[in-house]
Amino acid sequence: MVVLAAAIVVKSGKVIVSRHYVDMSRIRIEGLLAAFPKLVGMGKQHTYIETENVRYVYQPIEALFLLLVTTKQSNILEDLATLTLLSKLVPEYSMSLDEEGISRASFELIFAFDEVISLGHKESVTVAQVKQYCEMESHEEKLHKLVMQSKINDTKDVMKRKANEIDKSKIEKNKPGGFSSMGSMGSGRLESGFNELSISSGGGGGYGSGSGFGMISDVDPINTKPKDRSRSSVTAPPKSSGMKLGKSGKNQLMESLKAEGEDVIEDVKPTGQSKAAAPPPTDPFTLTVEEKLNVALRRDGGLSSFDMQGTLSLQILNQEDGFVQVQIATGENPEILFKTHPNINRDMFNNENILGLKRPDQPFPTGQGGDGVGLLRWRMQRADESMVPLTINCWPSVSGNETYVSLEYEASSMFDLTNVIISVPLPALREAPSVRQCDGEWRYDPRNSVLEWSILLIDNSNRSGSMEFVVPPVDSSVFFPISVQFAATSTYSGLKVTGMIPLRGGGGATPRFVQRTQLIAQNYQVI
């Protein structure tokens, strides 16, 4: 068996991919392949055609021909086995069996052909082995990546411990002095009980007994940066008139990153007018009602999954104000299941809708970071699409050398959505897509190849909208999954704080408090 060449040609005779395995000139290969389409129409066989010098063994693949050019002395049965193996490999490396798809995967196909045929002879391999050889996976490379990831995780743990130590030192500094030892011990014991039963807002949900419920905050150790030593107040050296190579090089780097679509935050010296960090709470009590949505919509319509998790947290400014109870009102939604913190009096909540500690002589802990102490949480899971606040429809269609994509959104009347961002993944493009129509604003991220559709506010004036853009021809699966971000000031539960009940002092007056309510899309996709 001697295979002279393996090729993929169109029925008109145009060669897309060709690989020859013997010493043969390009003119001869092109002549043999150019003569093949004329012989197909004349011959009566459907698997091979013989000429005076060579034999063509071929197989149709939609509008193409997979072709082996062999000598006449070659074993026809082995040639057919080789052709069958190659026909199984072609769909593995080409998404579409047309001229453009084969051209895009031409190098991968040549590498796969080389694994099957060596010096004109068939190798004893399978499709799985060929894919493994072409992937060229390295055990040492995987081990190196695991070691690097382990180092990164260790560094994050160290940064997290440092951040916790800094937070604890700040709390210790802010604690007022003069308390008796018994009072300090009691407060510390209760505060530790809340901390030990804290819940992470990014976890995998569920009301199992293993998850606690306390301080609701995610401390990102990466954002806790030490003070830049280069900005300390030292005597500035005298200015020189020499060339400032470092400055110009830095500016060029910044400009190049901006040209590639990267968001660059320039390192500037702080001034008195620069934006400061978020101010600390000034009100005695701050209550936060937050609901997070995790929704997966099907691209052909319907709901795949719906999960809403809500929390109510309390942040107290002063230690002496911790002897309080919280009066709430819940909406009439029987599908929402409420669960209190273990230190909260469950019977009082069920009978009077009041959140108070089991031990009224102990205050709520103060000095908690983030949103404060978690008091209540709830959850709702539905399979009804009518509860979804926003649905997205994506309609891609290929016409000639272009793919027309039509996007539509429909918003429910239950919520007014703000800061809506619909992110559509795109194939790798040399330039931004051609946007024909857009209700709102759009932005193309070339680094991540994502088209972002932004709507500042969705209310009764624009419950529906559309966007149309054009890209080169691609498979429709490229545009999924579509990610959606938004926020709202109303919630599914309708939970509201109606008042604060002081247990000590206050003269019966209702303490002043601030309530913050928000609904956010944590993981909202069209798959």
From Swiss-Prot:
Composition skew (Low complexity), residue ranges: 177-187, 239-250
Ranges where the record places region Disordered: 166-187, 217-250
PROSITE patterns: MHD
Transmembrane segments: none
Topology versus the membrane: Peripheral membrane protein
Major subcellular site: cytoplasm
Keyword Secreted: no
Domain MHD: 282-527
The UniProt record lists the keyword Nuclease: no
InterPro entries documented for this protein: AP2_Mu_C_sf (IPR036168), Coatomer_dsu (IPR027059), Longin-like_dom_sf (IPR011012), MHD (IPR028565)
Any one GO biological process: retrograde vesicle-mediated transport, Golgi to endoplasmic reticulum
Keywords noted in UniProt: Cytoplasm, Cytoplasmic vesicle, ER-Golgi transport, Golgi apparatus, Membrane, Protein transport, Transport
Subcellular location: Cytoplasm; Golgi apparatus membrane; Cytoplasmic vesicle, COPI-coated vesicle membrane
Biased segments, Basic and acidic residues type: 166-175
Pfam family membership, one: Adap_comp_sub
Cleaved signal peptide residues: none
Annotated CDD domains: AP_delta-COPI_MHD, Delta_COP_N
Domain of life of the native organism: Eukaryota
Gene3D superfamilies in alphabetical order: 3.30.450.60, Mu homology domain, subdomain B (2.60.40.1170)
Gene Ontology CC annotations of this record: COPI vesicle coat; Golgi membrane; plasma membrane; plasmodesma
Complex and partners: Oligomeric complex that consists of at least the alpha, beta, beta', gamma, delta, epsilon and zeta subunits.
Family, similarity comment: Belongs to the adaptor complexes medium subunit family. Delta-COP subfamily.
Role played: The coatomer is a cytosolic protein complex that binds to dilysine motifs and reversibly associates with Golgi non-clathrin-coated vesicles, which further mediate biosynthetic protein transport from the ER, via the Golgi up to the trans Golgi network. Coatomer complex is required for budding from Golgi membranes, and is essential for the retrograde Golgi-to-ER transport of dilysine-tagged proteins.
Name assigned to this protein: Coatomer subunit delta
